[in-house]
Every structure is written in C-alpha cells, then in structure tokens.
Amino acid sequence: MIIIKNGALVTPQGLRRADLAMDGDKIVRIAAAIEPAEGDTVEDAAGCWVFPGFIDGHTHMQCWTGMDWTADSFETGTRAAACGGTTTIVDYATADRGVTMPDALAEWHRRADGTCTANYAFHMALAEWNERNRADLSAMREAGVSSFKTYFAYDHLRLDDAETLEVLEELKYIGGILCVHCENGTLVNELQKRVFEQGIHGPEGHALSRPDVCEAEAVSRLLYLAHLAGDAPVNVVHLSTKLGLEAIRAAKARGQKNIYVETCPQYLMLDDTCYLEQGEDGFAGAKYVMSPPLRHAGDRAALREALVAGEIDTIATDHCSFNLHGQKDRGRDDFRAIPNGGPGVEHRPVAIATSFEGQLGPEDLCRLMSENPARVFGMYPRKGCLAEGADADVCVWDPKARWTIRATTQHQAVDYTPLEGFEAHGRAKAVFVNGVLAVRDGEPTGAQPGRYVPR
C-alpha cells in the first residue's frame, strides 16, 4: 500500500487531519492514523493539502481545428496536466460532417490510448444533426460518453436552433448533458469582415470582431431552447462576459433548472489589453487569440465576483495550444488566420489558487476543479472526492511552495504561456494517478498510468 501521512485531507466539510491509504488503483482506508506495514510506501504530507485529483472538463488535445493541429498530443498534454495536479481531463472528440460518432470516438481512442499520464474521458461534439447521429446517441452512452457539444459559431461546426433543440430533447431523454459554445457565428462572420475592412488586421481585431453581445445573445438563446426542451441539462462553456452572466442569472430567476456554468483562468485573470502586447516582433498579442476572446476588465471583475459568490460551477481551461512561431504567426497580416486557442492545462490549479488567495480556500478549489466537474460529467463519487472505494487519484499540494511560471520550464508542448512571469503560490508535491506516482515536485516520473474513464 501507499500511505499518505500527516496531511490535511480536503473534503466538502473542511480540512480533515487524517492519513489515507491506497492499494492498487483504489483508496482503501482513511483514518486518523494508519501505521505502515512492512513493504508499504509512506508519503509524508506534513504541511500539505491532500486533494482528490483535479479534473479539467474542457481540453482539445491532438486535434485538427480547421486551421491546424494543436501543439499538444495526448501524451504531452496529459503529462503537463498531471504536473500541475490534474489527474483527469475530459477532451472533446469531434464528429465532423460526414463522420459518424462511433468512428470519431474510435479515432480519439486511437490518439489517446496507451499514451497518457493523466486519465481521460471524452465529450462528443456534433457538427451535424441527422437520423444517424440521433440513433448513435444511445451508442455513445453505452461507450461511456454522457456529455456532448454543439456550436453556435464556426461555419463547419454550427447547428441551427431547431437542430440544437432536437439534440437537447434527445439528450434529456437518454440522460446526457449538452455543452455549448455560445457565440453568434453569423454575427461574428460579419463583424470580422467589417473590422478587417476598417484596416484593423492585427490581433486586436480578434476581440473587436467578437464583442460581448455575441456571447450574451447565444447564451440567452441556448437557455431558452433548453427551457423549451423541458429544462434539459446544459453546460455553458468558457463563459467570458458580464452580459452572458446576466443572461444566466435571468434564466435562473425565471426558475429554470439544470444550468451549469464553466469559466476559465484566462477570463478570470487576463483582459483584452493583452492583444496590444508587442514583444520582440510586434506580434505577441497573437498569443491570446482564443475564442471567446479575452474581455474588458469589467467582465473579468464580474466573473471573479460571481465565482467567489458560488454562481460558477467549474473552472476548466479550454486548453487548445498552438505555437506562436510556426502556427499563430501565419496570421500576421490577418487576425482571422490566427489559429484560435491557448495553453493552460498545466497551470490551472496554481493560477486559481494564487489569484484567489484569501478569497477561495482549499475546499473551494476542490469544489470548482475536482468535485463539481466529477458531478457534472458523471464521475462522482468515483472521482472528485477522497473516500474509501474511490479511485486513487490524489494530489498532495504544498501551499507554501513559491515559483515562477516560465515557458522555458513548462511541460506543455508549446513555445509560450499566457502566464509568463506569474509568481505562483503552491505546487503539486506528489500526484498519484490510479495509485501510481506520476509526478514528484511538479516534474513527471515517466509513468503513464492514465486510463479511459467511461461515464
């Protein structure tokens, strides 16, 4: 057995001084004191918080986005995730138009199986709605996929409102949840054209062409459609605006149920002034080209306040990494050609812990980045809590560690980090995935114990 001793276990009820024993891939005992037997391994967690492994419910690894392949494979991405304390990702498999969901799922398994340090589950994104996809929803549930995604943006992915309504109705019937990218795509297309024709070609044009109204309108539309479908469960992903937040508040005030809200560190910590960053070649602002874009400082403040108040359920990353040099720089003369996305899977826990120091305690960090993702996506209580019989995914966290985030020392396979120079408070001292030590002091051990997580 592996026994974690002298730590403070993070539970919904608060910190609990106790020891924890893992045998194989399960937590087998939690007690005030567990004495090791001959052959047991002891992990001293004195001065540390012991979390259930963090869960990132929104990643895009080894993925073609319509412009390019993301920089991180499942191998590099899950290794980076584990180095930060994340023991499970939920990645977006995508059934492009003309591709069936079973074929898409098989392809994502081919990319991920046997290569992962952290565990992985899959959402299934639908780029079209037809009778074959309707019939295959149940097959996806049987294959362990209980969450799906549709888009209101991107011409090659977007469903119309009637199709979205039908997806919501079907998922409510089979017990699934729909995650939705909420931007008004036709409006974005028009505004991109207008901004470019005004002579704005640099990264700042990205944010100008995707204003807060594009998100808020789509959030409101989604919630009305979900209500029409009998309050079908929906997850509003990567919420970035105050207006979008107000649309969610309005729906909840009407009494609508089954609304879940996700945001990301970038929308809680950065703002749209980043697009003016020049760097050595005058193009550093492209690092922050992601969709939705970084917003005004007022949006950031509103989301931070809502997070602390408990109005946001989960913090994910939307990790979708592209190199600045060789990928993003192909849009040097046209912001519309910059691949959308950025890295974040490695630094999410420490970024949130540090940025909200004094506002969010360890119980809150656990709720937002472990327990709630497990609940929303059908993994709780197997994951998302420290309990006898739960999976042995555990992060021993040293809150006293101090270090600086640098692209040169990160494990994400990308040539920059949006958090360059960030003074981080805390670090994953030891990370166990399925009972195997995967990370020691923020560095990988080389083990690849990650498994597929059917839900």
What is each of the regions a protein language model found here?
Residues 7, 329-334, 340, 388-454:
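C-terminal cap of metal-dependent C-N hydrolases
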Residues 102-118, 166-180:
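Alpha-helix-loop-beta-strand connector modules within alpha/beta enzyme cores
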Residues 7, 20, 25, 47, ...:
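Divalent metal-coordination and catalytic microenvironments
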Residues 1-3, 8-52:
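Histidine-rich, glycine-flanked metal-binding segment
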Residues 132-152, 156-315:
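Histidine/acidic residue-rich metal-binding segments in metalloenzymes
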Residues 45-115, 132:
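Metal-associated gating/positioning segment near the N- to mid-region
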Residues 86-90, 116-121, 145-147, 225-234, ...:
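Short, surface-exposed connector motifs at secondary-structure boundaries
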Residues 201-231, 282, 286-288, 308-309, ...:
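His/Asp/Glu-enriched, well-ordered alpha-helical/loop segment
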